[in-house]
């Protein structure tokens, strides 16, 4: 902001490229360091990719998270998410792209409100889905189409949906692009250190 003010002091009509300004803000938000594992970085990369896509025929390999089945062990600090029906490992907690809670279904009053977007019994809006980064097992479903269903790669049960144009979360927030997994279709599996096993059982 100070640099921009200095430039405009000399040239009042000077403008900054919005994309470059967005990159600078992202860099600042990440603590002035490039962190490809940051949720902010992952979300920004996907947003930029979605703006360029018309029919995704060839997606960059780096946008896909590693399939957890190809990893021998999940770090103790991470939660593993499995298909509730067949127990196939689907993604890790580091793949979840959190978002700011929206203002509820009323934010999309002009659109058809889905059942999952209705108010909960206690009057509070809740996120009934996880929005995640694409995982390697999703690639065949994503190629050549802008939206579709996300099915378990093992048992083919429906897990959620995706849309490069974006989807509405039940909290009212519009997420673009969206790779949405319904919480009711997955189970959390937490890995405990060996020393805590006895404590966890009791």
Language-model segments: what does each one mean?
Residues 142-158:
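Cys/His-rich Zn2+-binding "zinc-finger" mini-domains, especially FYVE domains
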Residues 1-130, 136-147, 187-202:
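PTP/DSP superfamily signal
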């Amino acid at each position: 902001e100070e640099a921009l003010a200095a430039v405009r002091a000399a040239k009042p009509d000077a403008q900054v490229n919005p994309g470059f300004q967005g990159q600078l803000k992202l860099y600042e938000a990440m603590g002035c360091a490039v962190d490809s594992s940051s949720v902010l970085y992952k979300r920004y990369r996907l947003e930029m990719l979605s703006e360029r896509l018309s029919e995704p025929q060839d997606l960059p390999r780096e946008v896909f998270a590693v399939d957890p089945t190809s990893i021998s062990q999940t770090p103790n600090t991470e939660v593993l998410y499995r298909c509730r029906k067949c127990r196939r490992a689907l993604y890790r907690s580091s793949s979840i792209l959190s978002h700011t809670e929206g203002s509820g279904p009323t934010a999309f009053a002009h659109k058809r409100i889905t059942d999952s977007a209705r108010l909960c019994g206690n009057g509070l809006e809740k996120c009934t889905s996880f929005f995640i980064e694409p995982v390697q097992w999703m690639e065949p479903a994503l190629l050549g189409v802008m939206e579709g269903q996300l099915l378990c790669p093992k048992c083919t049960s429906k897990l959620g949906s995706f849309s490069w144009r974006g989807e509405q979360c039940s909290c009212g927030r519009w997420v673009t692009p969206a790779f949405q997994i319904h919480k009711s279709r997955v189970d959390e599996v937490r890995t405990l250190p060996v020393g805590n096993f006895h404590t966890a059982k009791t």
